[in-house]
Amino acid sequence: MKKIALTMVATSILGVSSMSQAAINVCVFDLLGKSGESFQMAQEWALAAKGWGADVNLIPRQDEGVADNDFKAGKCDAVFETSMRARQYNKFAGSIDSLGGVPSNAVAQKVIAYALDARNATKMTTNLGGKKYEIAGIAPLGSAYIFVRDKNINSIEKAAGKKFAVLGYDPAQKIMVQRVGAQAVISDISNFVAKFNNGQVDMVGAPAYAYKPLEIYKGLGTNGAMFNFPVLQVTADLVIRPEKFPAGFGQKSRDYFVKNVAKSFAMINRLEAGIPAKYKMNLNPADKLKYQKLLREGRMELTKQGIYDPAMMSVLKKARCAVDKANFECALGGE
């Protein structure tokens, strides 16, 4: 009996041990799969995660929709995807990508560090339909710029009637494009630039991160241009099911992302510098102010519609005004 009891205890201990060491599957969206910048960043994070008691198995996904569906289906215990898609799990973090909300890398750095701070831990966790989700990291992917096939489309007025590829899962893009009188062409992250390159659409918004992998230069050709004016800041969220990870893992992971945010911006600066100067079209001060006001109006409208989180809108405005006190909106209410 004693031997049987000891055998049972040993089996139980081994079972618990194997459970605690079981690999945690994390789906990582990267346009270039394993060779992409995001996947390489995830590999460094996974190495650090071992020190927090998690054995992470990274699963590359070049189609973001597939990565998200795998997470929903339980094939992955976490997913690293754009905040625009991750907004469904956490509106506070997902609203950093609001239209015109983060006009520079300096503002982005302040906002990301604040959001990931321990004081906002409760805002990083949500309970949806009985399922718990937690944002365990936010990484910047850079400002999104508008690319046009014809550099003569150099104002809002001239964008009227033009076809603009928008991501179907982000209603904010569709609403904003319609506000300027352009035609929203519903697309996905896997084909929105392809439509620009083959002439199905006249305009597209994307960060420098996508310039080479998606070959945006093919759509620009010899007559295209990039508005050197950031429309929004693209970020990626690491969404986890906290029960699948060791206790306290979420905050340790968020602290890691804060420490590495400067490294991420170094990558972004390198990618932005890689876009040839011949394509970059600067706006005059009057047009720049006009666009800022248009984005502000759209942002406030989308917040009223419940698409953006009001608390994050307040955080973004404070960060913008801390970096640029002369900003016209700093003396205005409404956000």
Feature locations, PLM:
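Bilobed "Venus flytrap"/periplasmic-binding protein-like clamshell domains
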Residues: 23-52, 132-198, 202
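A beta-strand-loop signature enriched in Asp, Gly, Thr, and Trp
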Residues: 213-229, 238-241
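Bacterial N-terminal signal peptides
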Residues: 8-16
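Pocket-flanking alpha-helical
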Residues: 59-98, 147-149, 204-220
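Contiguous mixed-secondary-structure segments that line small-molecule binding/active-site clefts
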Residues: 82-179, 230-335
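Sec/Tat signal peptide C-region and signal peptidase I cleavage site
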Residues: 16-22
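Bacterial N-terminal signal peptides that target proteins for export
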Residues: 1-8
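N-terminal (or domain-start) structured segment
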Residues: 23-82, 88
